[in-house]
């Protein structure tokens, strides 16, 4: 705000990060309801002042990607998103109030964040979504149902978000497929990504200098295994 006062329209992000402590121990409580309210208030302040706003949410106190992790991330990120924040930091992968992160959490949180973004998008009301012509075609001239209509097939892709890991099978199919829980599926998916995705973000010469200096164990490609450097 001080920068905007001196230089109107200067690029800036309003990024306040007030944190909550559990008064019984003094430990940070990033997944608390109080933390969610504080971050939502910061987002609303940013909207009031007309500033692009970034807040922190998704900072569960749980040390594992368990039920506590899910419900704390769910309500903190959802409240922040619906309060009008433009950016939400720490929203994926974080555990133990920012003292750790977890590959399984990243892929679980990807599902969660997609669903939350869908709720922020809300219900679109326009000529296409009201579909009066489609109703007339189906109800007065057609089969009386929408199952095979081209608009139904189209809106299946635009209106619905399908989770990558979340289970929506019926009970019998779930049992037949091994009765896995989301942590097990997330572990397999995280390993699959790590073993098959090799982004090229570093100049090869710089990467070689880093590998010569440190015992890097990460593969650079699906067929190359890097052995630790022997000192």
Pin down the residues of each PLM region.
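Catalytic-core signal marking the mid-to-C-terminal active-site face
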Residues: 104-231
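Short gly/pro/ser/thr-enriched loop/turn and capping motifs at secondary-structure boundaries
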Residues: 94-98
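Short, small-residue-biased leader/transition segments that mark boundaries at the very start
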Residues: 1-3
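A conserved active-site cap/scaffold subdomain adjacent to cofactor or substrate pockets
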Residues: 6-91, 101-103
């Amino acid at each position: 705000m001080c920068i905007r006062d001196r230089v109107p329209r200067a690029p800036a992000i309003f990024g306040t990060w007030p944190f909550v402590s559990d008064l019984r121990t003094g430990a940070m409580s990033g997944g608390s309801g109080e933390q969610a309210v504080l971050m939502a208030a910061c987002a609303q302040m940013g909207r009031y002042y007309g500033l692009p706003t970034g807040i922190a949410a998704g900072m569960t106190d749980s040390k594992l990607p368990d039920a506590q992790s899910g419900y704390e991330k769910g309500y903190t990120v959802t409240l922040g998103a619906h309060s009008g924040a433009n950016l939400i930091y720490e929203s994926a992968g974080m555990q133990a109030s920012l003292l750790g992160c977890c590959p399984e959490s990243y892929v679980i949180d990807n599902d969660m964040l997609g669903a939350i973004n869908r709720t922020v998008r809300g219900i679109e009301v326009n000529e296409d979504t009201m579909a009066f012509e489609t109703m007339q075609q189906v109800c007065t001239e057609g089969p009386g149902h929408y199952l095979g209509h081209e608009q139904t097939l189209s809106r299946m892709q635009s209106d619905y978000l399908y989770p990558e890991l979340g289970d929506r099978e019926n009970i019998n199919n779930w049992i037949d497929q091994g009765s896995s829980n989301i942590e097990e599926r997330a572990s397999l998916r995280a390993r699959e990504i790590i073993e098959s995705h090799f982004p090229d973000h570093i100049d090869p010469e710089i990467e070689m200098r880093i590998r010569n200096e440190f015992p890097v164990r990460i593969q650079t490609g699906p067929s190359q295994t890097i052995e630790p450097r022997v000192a």
